[in-house]
Amino acid sequence: MMAAEAGGEEGGPVTAGAAGGGAAAASGAYPAVCRVKIPAALPVAAAAPFPGLAEAGVAATLGGGAALGSGFLGAGSVAGTPGGVGLSAGGAAAGVAGVAAAAAGAGGEMAFAKGTTSLPTETFGAGGGFPPLPPPPPQLPTLGAGLGTVDEGDSLDGPEYEEEEVAIPLTAPPTNQWYHGKLDRTIAEERLRQAGKSGSYLIRESDRRPGSFVLSFLSQTNVVNHFRIIAMCGDYYIGGRRFSSLSDLIGYYSHVSCLLKGEKLLYPVAPPEPVEDRRRVRAILPYTKVPDTDEISFLKGDMFIVHNELEDGWMWVTNLRTDEQGLIVEDLVEEVGREEDPHEGKIWFHGKISKQEAYNLLMTVGQACSFLVRPSDNTPGDYSLYFRTSENIQRFKICPTPNNQFMMGGRYYNSIGDIIDHYRKEQIVEGYYLKEPVPMQDQEQVLNDAVDGKEIYNTIRRKTKDAFYKNIVKKGYLLKKGKGKRWKNLYFILEGSDAQLIYFESEKRATKPKGLIDLSVCSVYVVHDSLFGRPNCFQIVVQHFSEEHYIFYFAGETPEQAEDWMKGLQAFCNLRKSSPGTSNKRLRQVSSLILHIEEAHKLPVKHFTNPYCNIYLNSVQVAKTHAREGQNPVWSEEFVFDDLPPDINRFEITLSNKTKKSKDPDILFMRCQLSRLQKGHATDEWFLLSSHIPLKGIEPGSLRVRARYSMEKIMPEEEYSEFKELILQKELHVVYALSHVCGQDRTLLASILLKIFLHEKLESLLLCTLNDREISMEDEATTLFRATTLASTLMEQSMKATATQFVHHALKDSILRIMESKQSCELSPSKLEKNEDVNTNLAHLLNILSELVEKIFMASEILPPTLRYIYGCLQKSVQHKWPTNTTMRTRVVSGFVFLRLICPAILNPRMFNIISDSPSPIAARTLTLVAKSVQNLANLVEFGAKEPYMEGVNPFIKSNKHRMIMFLDELGNVPELPDTTEHSRTDLCRDLAALHEICVAHSDELRTLSNERGAQQHVLKKLLAITELLQQKQNQYTKTNDVR
């Protein structure tokens, strides 16, 4: 309260805590009423005038007492003033040693003997009283600590963070204590070293990148570290974390998270003098925004702070009158000079009116509790706050201080805005609070009225907002993982000049980002399909700060899209860049790792019932296995990690126990340095496990892992010409030999061969020849293609690579309907809920099957013609081998199309990118029943005694058998190999280098084989000779050039 009176008996008690009891008392910090005996000899400066409390002709008494924030009374210290109570009034002061008093409420009063002036006391608010001590750091969990854990249902929220700005209440010193404006690195380092304390910091505008900022920090090792801060459309990004202000960024790294390991921001370093370098502009014409854009409407005379100068004359600004942010165009504004008051544009500031005009405004436009601020007439540089009560108008002086604060009534604030905010909550005069400011009137605006508005508006209409980001290397939509299991489709721009990945809600609103990632401090890692149960995922890991890993997850619609984005991002990631002079343009080097998690032995019974493994590269999780039962689980799962970032030096595997919790803790772990593995050779080893938790004498067990680490040195394509020619020979002697010696590397071999033959448009030769060989070697029609061979693996990979559009067209609508439905299709008596109607469930299942099968039958033309030609070749081959088996031509195609493509997509639609989220238990069960029914239809088999509850589907199978036969026959009805214009997107040099690496790894087996095989002997010996020659050339490249 700014005006109050109280009387007290000389030497009597002081009472603190009148109106309202006070916030501090309510919190239990100290009693609402505190009594302290004041000596009678206390000198009082009440008779002295208080300049700054009331200006001529206006009565106002201001209070400057203090509330004790620590919750106790200490002799000799009040509100942080050692030695007694300090009261300041225009140079007059009174202090008493060893006396303490506390006021407990907004209405509290302190009474002094022999005085008529009352000094009301108030609890500290934001900026009130003497500068308060900073609050203790919030007790928050450390972000991004160590190895993350996940549950089987893709809850990876631990190491991940969202694009939303940090929403934790943050406190920071005032801007003028740490912001230095435009400053070069050398001077920044000098100022920090002069401060002499580790933990000292400042923020400066970058001298190298105008418009961006740098946080300079003196570490415990006496090294000055510089952290880039990107300013974009009013937000501030460091690494990838977004803040709405630089003050919030300072508060976060002061109280919540470390900037370097174990080091937070501690001591702000102030500039030699205050810095006000923000560009300000004023509207010379009014403007109304275009709907559904990021533009803002404004009035003539509105003042703006410019945050970003975008392309084609657009600017991102804050309107000081409305606090609204958005786009304006420079044609509608004029520059505001440095000489103009920095408060110009605030809705409450009136810099061009006289004292009398201020009175008139408040009396005519304002109401009781209205206010405005204008420059002081008596003291240049000071300000006066004019406040209207129901009876009169009062004025209060606001004085800037040498330490860049503002004083009003003996209290210090970081800004005039803080003063206004304070007295919106606290009484400024007894019974009154600040409410609505009186805005500037039209007659106050000093503008050039001779502006040709018509021409300017016409110019604006011709401007485009499509080119805000000029150096766009890549753009398009990607899925980004949000909290929990949500994936959202967002619009991304890869900006090349500043190495930034910027993303937006949509392409239409691609102005203010939803988020921004500074790629210069990032690395890109692959994400295996197993981690989220969906393909085409990758992650960007921020690795520049103390938080070990800061992760963003993304997914492409297709493997090609994900690969394109990863390659584009890697080119701008700091960790992927070669040092000058270390790279050889003629020789590339790519590392890959294949892990087979085989089994575990003697896991602790107490801790494991359903164990699964989490796989990390360094400390970044990239994959996980399924959960298995027991203490000796067998997984036999393969994980391929291609094109590893160059900083990867180890893999880690942790073991967790699957529970119903959202996250399962890591219990056991093993680590293996890649340098231990012989390059190009498979290692099969039992690793002893270590424990994250005390096992109390129990042995942790062991884990069997097969690992193959390869480092491909890729030479120019012409070096592989003879090698390629030998592989592509139509007899496929090299392919047959490699399939014989590469049993454990079958999947890798198939992937490499398919890419090479696709590039040469010879995939049909490869697949048809291998399929024919498989058919010729099989005696029993019923077991054809049941085993996993190179031929079946190649067919499966080929379908997944080329038939995605067919799968989506045939299945997506029905699967989405299943996902949305709450109706069960359960038919099994053991799984039916109580009172559940099986007939209703069956009708729902048959309805789904009818819709789904109809879509599949109608989608035959969408299958790639080359794949259909291969199906036709299969049909001809089996007809020739088993001429009397009339169903074989149908079943050989269904075995691939349904068993290896359509039914797996129905069972796990996330793996085929049909859905983003995991299906509910009802939906998952429905998908299983649908897949079983479709597979039986494709096999032309009805349900029988094994699953009698499914017999209700048999009429559907019978009625659709003939259509299924016609559909499968039609798929193979492409008698001639079609011409294709599609160009393969493979990296031929790398694929040839990878195949050469396999030949080197299996050279001993190939040499043995070359001595046994008659017809292949010549070809295999030539292969061995070429393999050796390529190895010698590779060594020559390595010796003559340093390869990173």
Swiss-Prot record:
The record marks 786 as: Arginine finger. Transmembrane segments: none annotated. Its main location: cytoplasm. The modification N-acetylmethionine is found at residue 1. Residues 276-338 form the SH3 domain. Keywords: Acetylation, Cytoplasm, GTPase activation, Phosphoprotein, Repeat, SH2 domain, SH3 domain. The modification Phosphoserine is found at residue 828. It is found in: Cytoplasm. Interacts with SQSTM1. Interacts with SPSB1; the interaction does not promote degradation. Interacts with CAV2 (tyrosine phosphorylated form). Directly interacts with NCK1. Interacts with PDGFRB (tyrosine phosphorylated). Interacts (via SH2 domain) with the 'Tyr-9' phosphorylated form of PDPK1. Interacts with tyrosine-phosphorylated EPHB4. This is Ras GTPase-activating protein 1. It comes from Bos taurus. The gene is RASA1.
